[in-house]
């Protein structure tokens, strides 16, 4: 096949996919999306009861006529819903791949903006072909299926310590700030509606307050999609993200409260107090349900060590169960799934295996990425249609009031909260927090959820909400990166914390806790220390099993150590049987057993001070995971093990050499067995041992006597061997250099012969050793003057030095 055929085969799947998607939308005007998102129960009823083969009747025949077996059939309605859902997910994934093929595009335009543009393009194509409104996103589908994976991913990988350290500021912005924006926008819009020239007099105060509550919701999906790309510092990121996560619960509560007030004919004082009580019940109840199911999930994973396959399943089941349970009781599902995810991250992670933990991370990232992509695409698709009503005054003033009240709320509330913060928020931080108030899918879903019977101007609310969403996502989302660079806002530090830094941080935590305890101040350090003690004493013992799973690196290290111990025992390097002499001196000692309290204390000390294998995720990223540090840890552990093996082998070899190479047992290997040494050498050996420093006790003496290192083997003539030894005896510091030959001061240099040799060898000494060998140990100083005329032996067993790893034979290199 030529190049043209190859290119055609590559382009064919994409073209067929687009043609198939468009043909399905044209052939089925209602669309599976309409049945799935707009009329899901009817679609489920139709798909769950397919026509049986017996009831299928061919066209043009009566029920009594016999039908023949067809060769090829097409039953698209039977697979319509899952088929189109698969195509939409595939299209969204291909769109994300296409965006990231050009690396500079996601840095200029956020991914959420590109996905909305794709949705607008598809919605325009569907609207132009069918001349009908494209299928809109049903709110139940958004709240029950698309939103939970995103919130679960955000809560599971949220840095818990910065979140709780800034919890007061986050709660202040989320609760008081949302009330500020909702009431301010609602009252301001009601004032605009009182102007008769705008034609908005039919919109009441409660309807404006309801619209203000839903339009003031800062969306975590939009915030994550934008803020993860600009890499602001961790404190600023956690403030904006935490506010967007918590104010959703406040927004939903206010939305339901004002919606109920709008449907009432008369509002009494009891209803107002009931609404305030409902506000606290919804938020606190959702948190309690999430924590409870998180504890149950951790307790369940204590018993999954024999069935590792189902460990990731419990994480997703319990988290989704917390969300739908909270929604069933009309509590905050977002708060429930966030609390459940943070609880499971602390306890479930300790029980599951490393492979299960990796599966949980990747599957959670995949679900959140797909859900986020579908949300933004459906926002673009649902925008195109006929369900809009335009009013310049209402739309423009809504956008202006959203920006004004957001900025005023951040600046006013920050001035109050800075009185209680150790590190106050600067003007740049306040500006970025106000600028990062992005609206998104939650506002879009809530405005579509309004009943048309109670709100006759629903289309106007939809149009105004879409304008605010598109302005914040496109204009603010695109310009926030250059604005952060222009203001020189502190960025996040991607450098991983070193061990010394972590130790010092823990040390300062304990110091600050002690200072707060002495001063009687109950700060966050005090409460963190109290919770840690309670956690170690009760919760961890109940929720985490004792034999915690270890990393594969630890398992490998354990196997290597066991193998090394077995090899040492088999080769006899470790003697497990004591000698009879040692048994005579052995005293029976009773070993006291440790109490359970002492064992717990030892475990606590080891758990605090030992090297931790699994590293926690310090920074959050939407689509990518942090680099795995197992390779670096494996390298570090293997280096430590090799070092320990070298130390053990060095000690064993040195001790064996010391026992074998003592001065009393050393002999010349070149001589026959049982051959006695000359008397003078034996006297010299006795003198060296008589000094009280034998080679066994003092290695330097043994080395001086018998450490005959390799040297140039030149056999001296008999007539000047004695004089040459006298030259060796002289000290090197009294020598002078003559050319390349060292001559003692009392000896004049002899003339050289033609062949380069010396004419009077008795008056000149040529060193037989190199400079390094001569000045290394000073072995020649200990030789005697009377050397036998025989040449020195070639192979000699030398006395070993502790820690010296040189060879034992004389012909080895030093």
Swiss-Prot record:
Identification of the protein by name: Sodium/hydrogen exchanger 2
Role, per record: Plasma membrane Na(+)/H(+) antiporter. Mediates the electroneutral exchange of intracellular H(+) ions for extracellular Na(+). Major apical Na(+)/H(+) exchanger in the base of the colonic crypt. Controls in the colonic crypt intracellular pH (pHi) to direct colonic epithelial cell differentiation into the absorptive enterocyte lineage at the expense of the secretory lineage.
Subunit structure: Interacts with CHP1 and CHP2.
Entry's family note: Belongs to the monovalent cation:proton antiporter 1 (CPA1) transporter (TC 2.A.36) family.
Phenotype upon loss of function: SLC9A2 null mice do not develop diarrhea, have no changes in quantitated intestinal Na(+) absorption, however mice develop a sharp reduction in the number of gastric parietal and zymogenic cells associated with a loss of net acid secretion in adult but not in juvenile mice. SLC9A2 null mice also exhibited reduced recovery from laser-induced ulceration of the stomach. Double-knockout of SLC9A2 and SLC9A3 are not significantly different than the SLC9A3-deficient alone in diarrhea, intestinal Na(+) absorption, or reduced life expectancy.
UniProt keyword Transport present: yes
Organism in which the protein naturally occurs: Mus musculus
Keywords: Antiport, Cell membrane, Ion transport, Membrane, Sodium, Sodium transport, Transmembrane, Transmembrane helix, Transport
GO cellular component terms given for this protein: apical plasma membrane; brush border
Keyword Transport: yes
Species lineage: Eukaryota, Metazoa, Chordata, Craniata, Vertebrata
Membrane-spanning segments: 108-128, 139-159, 170-190, 210-230, 238-258, 279-299, 309-329, 362-382, 393-413, 431-451, 460-480
Free-text tissue specificity from the UniProt record: Expressed in the colonic epithelium predominantly in the cryptal region. Maximally expressed in the luminal membrane near the crypt base and in the middle of the crypt (at protein level). Expressed in gastric epithelium (at protein level).
Pfam families associated with the record: Na_H_Exchanger (PF00999), NEXCaM_BD (PF16644)
Activity control: In colonic crypts activated by low pHi, hyperosmolarity, and an increase in intracellular cAMP levels.
Annotated spans, Disordered: 647-710, 740-814
Residue ranges with Basic and acidic residues bias: 647-661, 771-782, 798-814
InterPro entries per the UniProt record, alphabetical: Cation/H_exchanger_CPA1, Cation/H_exchanger_TM, NaH_exchanger, NHE-2/4, NHE_CaM-bd
Cell location: Apical cell membrane
Catalytic activity: Na(+)(in) + H(+)(out) = Na(+)(out) + H(+)(in)
Topological category with respect to the lipid bilayer: Multi-pass membrane protein
Superkingdom to which the source organism belongs: Eukaryota
